[in-house]
Regions:
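Active-site-adjacent betaalpha module
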Residues: 1-85
Length: 85
């Protein structure tokens, strides 16, 4: 699935979670702009809806509002068991 959004947080993950035929062995990959706003918000919403799913954030496919903010967002995601690759 590719989700094209126009704002930072979305609850589309809830309906997708119910309708997706993704088993827990499948990896969900995330990326986007801004790491510290959009990406981290959606990663944490995704984690809430799919607590046992393997989720990866591609750090080189993201950009933050600053280098420090980008790094901080990656640390937050990592602390919530989102693998940073």
């Amino acid at each position: 699935y590719v989700v094209d959004k126009d704002t930072f947080g979305t609850f589309i993950w809830g309906s997708m979670s119910v309708n997706m035929s993704v088993d827990e062995d499948t990896t969900i990959e995330i990326c986007g702009v801004c790491t510290d706003i959009c990406v981290v918000s959606n990663a944490l919403i995704m984690r809430a809806f799919r607590p046992n799913q393997k989720i990866e954030c591609h750090k080189d496919w993201c950009a933050g509002t600053s280098v420090a903010a980008h790094e901080a967002a990656l640390k937050v995601m990592e602390s919530c068991q989102i693998e940073i690759v």
